[in-house]
Amino acid sequence: MRVYVNGIGLIAPGLNGWAASVPILAGSADYIAGPLTIPVLEILPPAERRRTPTVVKLAIAAGCEALANAGQAAAKIATVFTSSGGDGDVIHQICETLTEPEREVSPTRFHNSVHNAPAGYWGIATGAHEPSTSLCAYDASFAAGLIEAATQVSIDGHSVLLVAYDAPYPE
């Protein structure tokens, strides 16, 4: 099996994009801790931008950067989204709501709680109609996503965008 990486997107605290992160990751520049800075996602319609949770914005921004660095269009590429636990903030908010007497869970929070929410927002943002897979394998999520993407490339012979994303859980 032969696969290769055609483009990378990277967004993390103190690492604002792949090009800016390479010297830090290579050890030729010092890492300076900083806040997580997610670019404004003009690719999403305004209504979707307002209700999109941070972890989904993170996934979409990283995917957009990877495709831009690869010189590929989003609408014609299959995707694999992988996360160790999905959107912990949304799940935490839902669990807190369920402890209240009214137990009225926001429909927006509920639809953002599913593990394939980033894939759905990706489709809305890019108009993509290609297959999408959403995975969760806890600490092995990146490896599971890489295996899934490589398998799709090997079997189907087309490019696949792998988006691995995570955000800290609430305290």
PLM regions and their residue ranges:
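Conserved "HGTGT" condensation-loop signature of ketosynthase/thiolase-family condensing enzymes
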Residues: 1-134, 157, 164-171
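Cysteine-centered functional microenvironments
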Residues: 130-144
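A generic local secondary-structure boundary/capping motif
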Residues: 150-151
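Anion (oxyanion) recognition and catalysis
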Residues: 154
